[in-house]
C-alpha cells in the first residue's frame, strides 16, 4: 500500500509537492531535487512528517 507524503524545500521550508511512497520504502525519508517557486531555483526537497 502506498502512503501520501509531502515534500518541503530544504532552503525555505515551503511545502511545494505531494507524492506517493510505497510501504516497502517507509524506513528512509525521500530526498528529491525539485523546483521551488519561492526560491526560484531547483533545490533539495525533503519528506515531511
UniProtKB/Swiss-Prot annotation:
Name of the gene: rpmG1
NCBIfam families according to UniProt: PRK00504.1, PRK00595.1, rpmG_bact
Organism: Bacillus licheniformis (strain ATCC 14580 / DSM 13 / JCM 2505 / CCUG 7422 / NBRC 12200 / NCIMB 9375 / NCTC 10341 / NRRL NRS-1264 / Gibson 46)
Keyword Ribonucleoprotein assigned: yes
Record keyword Transport present: no
One cellular-component annotation, GO: ribonucleoprotein complex
Top-rank taxon: Bacteria
Protein family: Belongs to the bacterial ribosomal protein bL33 family.
Organismal lineage: Bacteria, Bacillati, Bacillota, Bacilli, Bacillales
Family annotation (InterPro entries): Ribosomal_bL33, Ribosomal_bL33_CS, Ribosomal_bL33_sf, Ribosomal_zn-bd
UniProt entry keywords in alphabetical sequence: Ribonucleoprotein, Ribosomal protein
Designated name of the protein: Large ribosomal subunit protein bL33A
GO biological process: translation
Disulfide bonds: none
UniProt-recorded Gene Ontology molecular function terms: structural constituent of ribosome
